[in-house]
């Protein structure tokens, strides 16, 4: 070890000690060879793995992180995220379109700017919301938002549960009109009204009929502070997932209710890192069935 630094020697001794705490060059060499062999086995990107990756990305639109996390959690052989990203980049360079099925298409996107919204009268502030909601440990607390179509025409309602990340979506027949939105929300959630304790929204005038929502669904409706999208971070993130299927500047006239249900299913069927790679739909229906 004459040419090695003291720190290198220390690491070598620490990594390759025997069970008795002593260092043996022979044992160290055997451990090193075993470690290399294990690394080679783990890193080999087999044909079966590639088929699995292609399926999850192209058919289910799972992220690389979701694929790796789900496979490791369920004992399915898989390589690391870096290897999969290299595979996607290589596919793109070879004229493939696998990257088009990833959420950001290998590009970093900047956050959208938020426009000023009208004041909603007699609303309950998020500051009045029970503390347990912010802890995100109790089932039954939801965030609501709208995704707006091209030219500010048409709207899709999104409602997501905080603990399971279960998403419900609906294309609104009359866009952002408050009465129509309330009608659609009540109709969509009526079968699950016993599992909705609170809903938190932004200050958009489209939620001004919240009192009727509270009465019909027997819940409490709260509003975040103006220009504070981080108070509804789950909605913001979930809308980003929806945008993978419905990009900005999409004309909503071309989107069918069947397609909305299909996108909803796919998002709820993705394993999520925040859920320890469980799927939202599995966790949600464990609670309600």
Q: Where do the PLM segments sit?
A:
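Short, basic alpha-helical/linker "hinge" immediately adjacent to a nucleic-acid-recognition surface
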Residues: 1-60, 65, 70, 76
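Mobile genetic element proteins and their domesticated derivatives, centered on retroelements
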Residues: 9-12, 53, 67, 84, ...
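Basic, flexible linker segments flanking DNA-binding modules
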Residues: 25-34, 77-134
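Charged alpha-helix within mobile-element recombinases
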Residues: 47-60, 190, 211-221, 225-289
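Two-metal-ion RNase H-like nuclease active-site motif
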Residues: 139-149
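Short conserved beta-strand segments at catalytic cores or DNA/RNA-binding microdomains
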Residues: 147, 151-169
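Active-site beta-loop-alpha junctions of metal-dependent nucleic acid enzymes
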Residues: 150-152, 169-193
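Acidic/histidine-rich, metal-coordinating catalytic segments
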Residues: 194-209, 227
């Amino acid at each position: 070890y004459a040419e090695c630094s003291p720190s290198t020697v220390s690491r070598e001794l620490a990594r390759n000690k025997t069970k008795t705490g002593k260092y043996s060059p022979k044992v160290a060499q055997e451990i090193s060879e075993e470690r290399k062999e294990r690394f080679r086995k783990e890193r080999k990107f087999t044909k079966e793995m590639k088929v699995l990756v292609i399926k999850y990305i192209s058919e289910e639109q799972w992220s690389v992180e979701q694929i790796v996390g789900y496979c490791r959690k369920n004992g399915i052989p898989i390589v690391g995220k870096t290897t999969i990203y290299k595979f996607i980049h290589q596919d793109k360079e070879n004229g493939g379109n696998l990257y088009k099925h990833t959420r950001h298409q290998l590009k970093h996107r900047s956050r959208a700017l938020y426009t000023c919204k009208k004041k909603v009268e007699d609303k309950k502030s998020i500051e009045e919301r029970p503390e347990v909601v912010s802890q995100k440990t109790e089932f039954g607390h939801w965030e609501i938002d709208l995704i707006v179509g091209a030219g500010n025409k048409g709207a899709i309602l999104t409602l997501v549960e905080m603990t399971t990340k279960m998403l419900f979506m609906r294309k609104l027949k009359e866009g952002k009109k408050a009465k129509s939105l309330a009608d659609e929300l009540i109709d969509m959630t009526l079968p699950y009204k016993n599992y909705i304790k609170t809903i938190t929204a932004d200050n958009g005038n489209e939620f001004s009929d919240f009192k009727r929502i509270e009465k019909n669904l027997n819940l409490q409706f709260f509003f975040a502070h103006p220009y504070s999208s981080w108070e509804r971070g789950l909605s913001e993130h979930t809308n980003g997932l929806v945008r993978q299927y419905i990009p900005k500047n999409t004309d909503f006239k071309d989107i069918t209710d069947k397609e909305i249900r299909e996108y909803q299913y796919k998002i709820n069927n993705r394993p999520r890192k925040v859920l320890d790679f469980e799927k939202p739909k599995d966790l949600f229906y464990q609670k309600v069935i």
